[in-house]
Amino acid sequence: MEIMNNQNQCVPYNCLNDPTIEILEGERIETGYTPIDISLSLTQFLLSEFVPGAGFVLGLIDLIWGFVGPSQWDAFLVQIEQLINQRIEEFARNQAISRLEGLSNLYQIYAEAFREWEADPTNPALTEEMRIQFNDMNSALTTAIPLFTVQNYQVPLLSVYVQAANLHLSVLRDVSVFGQRWGFDVATINSRYNDLTRLIGTYTDYAVRWYNTGLERVWGPDSRDWVRYNQFRRELTLTVLDIVSLFPNYDSRTYPIRTVSQLTREIYTNPVLENFDGSFRGMAQRIEQNIRQPHLMDLLNSITIYTDVHRGFNYWSGHQITASPVGFAGPEFTFPRYGTMGNAAPPVLISTTGLGIFRTLSSPLYRRIILGSGPNNQNLFVLDGTEFSFASLTADLPSTIYRQRGTVDSLDVIPPQDNSVPARAGFSHRLSHVTMLSQAAGAVYTLRAPTFSWRHRSAEFSNLIPSSQITQIPLTKSINLGSGTSVVKGPGFTGGDILRITSPGQISTLRVTITAPLSQRYRVRIRYASTTNLQFHTSIDGRPINQGNFSATMSSGGNLQSGSFRTAGFTTPFNFSNGSSIFTLSAHVFNSGNEVYIERIEFVPAEVTFEAEYDLERAQEAVNALFTSSNQLGLKTNVTDYHIDQVSNLVECLSGEFCLDEKRELSEKVKHANRLSDERNLLQDPNFRGINRQPDRGWRGSTDITIQGGDDVFKENYVTLPGTFNECYPTYLYQKIDESKLKAYTRYQLRGYIEDSQHLEIYLIRYNTKHETVNVPGTGSLWPLSVENPIGKCGEPNRCAPQLEWNPDLDCSCRDGEKCAHHSHHFSLDIDIGCTDLNENLGVWVIFKIKMQDGHARLGNLEFLEEKPLVGESLARVKRAEKKWRDKREKLQVETNIVYKEAKESVDALFVNSQYDRLQADTDIAMIHAADKRVHRIREAYLPELSVIPGVNAGIFEELEGRIFTAYSLYDARNVIKNGDFNNGLSCWNVKGHVDVEEQNNHRSVLVVPEWEAEVSQEVRVCPGRGYILRVTAYKEGYGEGCVTIHEIEDNTDELKFSNCVEEEVYPNNTVTCNDYTANQEEYGGAYTSRNRGYGESYESNSSIPAEYAPVYEEAYIDGRKENPCESNRGYGDYTPLPAGYVTKELEYFPETDKVWIEIGETEGTFIVDSVELLLMEE
């Protein structure tokens, strides 16, 4: 084992690691804005937010068109240039970037116009502006996109072409959906819709054509060629093909409601090898054959890894994979073993947990083994370790390591799709399979390289069918294929492989899980391409459902293009009988030899009219109940922010097919209600966009608080407060309501919603404290136990689950066996305001605190709002409370003046002058501690309810504490020995033998030398010719002596000896002995002439303070404002003197060179050292 020598790691004044540098082990902390990062974020957005409206428009602004600048656009070009080794001419490059910048500027204007129109859709001026902006945007895109197809540069410009095409399709969809409300006539809208459907095909075919051209261009025979080929395939899948595969969803008439797509294609990281370069001649085809052929999607369960050894080097020699069909609908199956079954070590089992493996950290090993002279040398290319990390949306899961963790990080080439959350939650791909590249060439080389396959996270483990969206399921997620069906490579625009059938019969079966009530009805659509007319038949659990005639879409022998595929369906709706069902698709009535390709099936909700009408009526009643009148000028006082969110959920769950216009109208009213709620809420950032974002406004809190997105209880962000290990360090969240926002003689109310809590304390503080401890049992969920999957495809809550029973009055009607929220989850506290004073700015402190280890809370929808003016008894009560508070404040001021004066004198006595830049020569550590204790006698430096909030005396307290801190710093700087008090363990000390650093009951760290052969030493730089004082505080147990020696390289040695003090000992240059040390210290008090004289006496209580004052102060503040027992622990307030038996000795030393050595040892027994100081004498 190699032992590192860290002797030279000590540096003056800082023997510890840099505290500003933090390494997050196992976490990818760098976030980039590369083309791949941007494209993954866009794909995530298109998969999750593909709904027309201002939200989609502004989302494109945030992700690309309002964010990406010239440097990022240039990066899109450089990415492909490097892959194909072709440079775009400067003119074409500048033209492309200028056009993209122009489109970005224009789209930002379009987005702002859209946002303003959506906020006020009946405004004629805004409607006219929307027509103008659409026409300008459409014209600009129609003109610009051909400029991204410059001859000879089609491939390098491909990724920016796709970005512009995506923008154009989104704008055309906007006019197809909103054009009539913008004032366009039906003929114009239909014309633009025809443009939309035509351009979906045009843009798709162009992108796939030039992708294939570029891919062919980078192919070559050697391993280096394959690496570039695979990189092109992987990166352009992410930046081009994934986006193109979602273009059909822009067809607003085929997909009028939210549509969920899945990408089942796989991408590949390179075989994990070191020195994997062009030296492997002719191996490209061999490596490509290592990639799996088109196949049904399966779910990786486990990898069993085998280890072999070669010339003393262990490596991954082979592995075996187990997997399950989609939905785990069938028994687990095992793949044939890859590589060889080595037996150099026990097999390692990697079992998939959480949401799958999202990251690998691999350690490739290359060794050139010398077998002798001549050509017998052998190269070993293997993998000797990999760490597998598991995805989770909630908490870190322990990784599994095969042998060791490496540095080849899969996230470097397949980054997360969301860098705002940890990679375990923001990941973009899961590990789907591992193959093995195996090669051996006799005595030349041995090669074993696992190759990892990755599938996009949108490919769900199951086939879930909810009621509120169109669900697209790729048929490669089938669990069985018919006898005439095969899986073939997709054409590039389908997001994965597809099925092919050449003879009539069953195509495939899928296991589907219904998350909607079984009464929900659906219609099935099929996206297919066919060289012949045919019939499709469907059945559920063996029960025939639909059959219909479908026409041919392409000629025999033709290439598969976007226009070859058609989406068609059955008109008759149906419903499922079981929550988990087998869906079967068959093809009939066509001649064998023809070709039928099926990409996916789609389940489209067929809304039942009376159900939709009932939902609409209920939503209308709930929305109208929010307001004080029909003109929606004001909110009812009892309408909470949580109430508005629930009404919003009710509106969002309305059918967009049945009552689209009514839904939009109700949505506008709810948004208006939410704006009114925001206007009356005096809290800053009530939706928790951040904590500790600004030092003087918004929320402040402890670092263990987390902000989480909405769940099935909260629509907006909410906070989670965990328990704490120590009452003096509570979990806390607070905010101050500024005096300027408050009205005199008015009652205000704090209210919100608590999902669950234990030992949650809530405070409102002004003249006194309003305090409540809230324990709310968690509901676990608002969803009934009968609902199996109340979550969406990306883990988001499905608030439209039909079993949810919600009452607009927020009264809970719980059926037996179900969970729900009830009134105890709503909390409110009120506080009365007397007269207001902007100069004093007393304000109101809002505090949430947990000081118990088993405490916790989840809360949100917080509001602080005006309730009513004070009159009668409540007015008299607040005036009385205000007067009482002012009387107490005056008494506090009298005491503070006295205590502050004495504390300041004690602090000033530590220093030479009022600049506080030099200590008195005789200032020692005990004097600094004593002054610090006196400073801590200042009361009300911080609020007793939460000691991080400054109180009325915070200013003077922090002034003196700052000087105390300066004194400590000057004292430490004066000591040229580093870590002389052992507070940092043995850092900066050289150790021989066995020694310990222990923390004693008085919270001091001491060095314990238990054995005579042990030695602790430190090399110290000094100034030759100057005088120094070596001061040591130590304690000797047992027989023998403890020694602290100071010496130079040659001679000039002196030492301090410590024993049990049986008899007096006299040391050179030091007349202090164990027996007379205490006596001498007492004499020093009268002998000193510095400002520290009499310090011991001044430390005691001063008789000038009135004897009755302290109890008066206690009485004054016992009424609602108790002292904080933790406040005395701030700073050095808990300092305790040394226990009896410790002795301080010192000697004078005059070095002749610039280096001295301090050595600590003993002859027998135990030697305990509290501190070692080497102080430079004053000149």
Swiss-Prot record:
Keywords: Sporulation, Toxin, Virulence. It comes from the Bacteria. The keyword NADP does not apply. One of its GO terms (molecular function) is signaling receptor binding. PANTHER family: ENDOTOXIN_N DOMAIN-CONTAINING PROTEIN-RELATED (PTHR37003), PESTICIDAL CRYSTAL PROTEIN N-TERMINAL DOMAIN-CONTAINING PROTEIN (PTHR37003:SF2). Belongs to the delta endotoxin family. This is Pesticidal crystal protein Cry1Ad. The lineage of its organism: Bacteria, Bacillati, Bacillota, Bacilli, Bacillales. The gene is cry1Ad.
